[in-house]
Amino acid sequence: MSRVCELTNRKKSFGNKVSHSNRKTKRTFLLNLHKVTLTSDILNKKFRFRVATRTLRTIDYKGDLDAFLLNTRTIKLSEKAQKIKRRLKKVLVKQEVELAVSDA
């Protein structure tokens, strides 16, 4: 398994390790990944992801998985997350149509 966040596609980054004498050597910064199960309230489904803690904090800040996906630009999401976002939008449109029909 590669060390990639399955929601945001974030990967390891590169930089320099700087010693006390200011010598610089190449190093990598790995993501802090966790296996989590996130629930979509709109779809009534559970999804399993390997997610970076930074992404988990953002999801917590936004409220839930649905709010995170709907408020995040599609370009920044992975393919798996984009598919879920499309399904969310379809369900929301369907609910709006049903509300409009029932009101009329």
UniProtKB/Swiss-Prot annotation:
GO terms for molecular function: structural constituent of ribosome. GO terms for cellular component: cytosolic large ribosomal subunit. InterPro entries: Ribosomal_bL28, Ribosomal_bL28/bL31-like_sf, Ribosomal_bL28_bact-type, Ribosomal_bL28_sf. One of its GO terms (biological process) is translation. SUPFAM superfamilies: L28p-like. Pfam families: Ribosomal_L28. HAMAP family: Ribosomal_bL28. Belongs to the bacterial ribosomal protein bL28 family. This is Large ribosomal subunit protein bL28.
